């Protein structure tokens, strides 16, 4: 809802300021194609979420994969038969166009993962407020400012290959640097500020590379398409951004929780609900007698009600000194598991960017420009 006022102002401004343009010869919109595309993407998201949340429902996973595959194949076949397809797949035969789309998907995929991973990690482990963790994650966008502004100027001097593939490679390096910043005390309890220098440096470096890529990906997509496909190319560009963000939240978000479930080692006597998510573990810690440390105390007011007293087992239900000690052990176990899953997700982002850099470097010739 925070975006509603901004959208309302933009809509009013467009209504009164933007000139109206109509194309009497516009291609007809094909509703069945849109439905098939929506069904294929929705099934893909459902399959990803099902596969990354143990215990895996094999029946639901198989149904989602089969539905997505059938809908995707039906969409492709329909586009090949239509005189005015919703998506002309021949556009992807142009290397610059394909590289631009891949670059756009890679950037938005990684950006979504960074925003989610950093904000979640520094809220649940380091005790940051949502505003503080959001501002920390936004350092990535600060890094994109110089390269995204200057990318268009550099394009005619160094070409698409260095900007798209090179930008993705620099972004991967930044992700690796950022993944090393886990602020922990020697005692094992998380610190609020240690290691932030590495994180900020890594996010700035990643932003610098991703900004260079995204600044020219649009140029590569639109200018590589024939004039009569310019509108379709613009639509593909927008879908690439949205598809990357969609995959990021569905895959990396689910993986963040799924890996936590795999990595967490619960102390004896702790309710199994603590293995579902770190918020559930913190809820149990708080319910055992308020054992949350000072830097996490404010989270106790906002935790979801995932457990109640009858759900506690062993000494955690006693509310005594032993309960508080076991709660402290659960806290460290949960935070350690979440940090491990966070690190894996950050490294996976670096791997995705490295793969994107290699593929786009193969697609594009040295000093190639969009044409």
Cite the ranges covered by each PLM segment:
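Symmetry-related core transmembrane helices of the 12-TM Major Facilitator Superfamily/SLC fold
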Residues: 2-14, 36-37, 64-68, 346-360
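Transmembrane core module of solute transporters
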Residues: 2-4, 32, 59-60, 71, ...
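Residue-level hotspots within transmembrane alpha-helices of multi-pass secondary transporters
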Residues: 42, 149-153, 216, 246, ...
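Interfacial helix-cap and linker-helix signal at transmembrane-aqueous boundaries
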Residues: 48, 122-123, 154-155, 255-260
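Helix-loop-helix hairpins in multi-pass membrane proteins, especially solute transporters
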Residues: 1-33, 59-62
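Phenylalanine-glycine-rich, low-complexity intrinsically disordered regions
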Residues: 22-23, 38-61, 77
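Hydrophobic transmembrane architecture of multi-pass small-molecule transporters
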Residues: 185-194, 243-359
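Membrane-interface helix caps of multi-pass small-molecule transporters
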Residues: 16, 46, 77, 149, ...
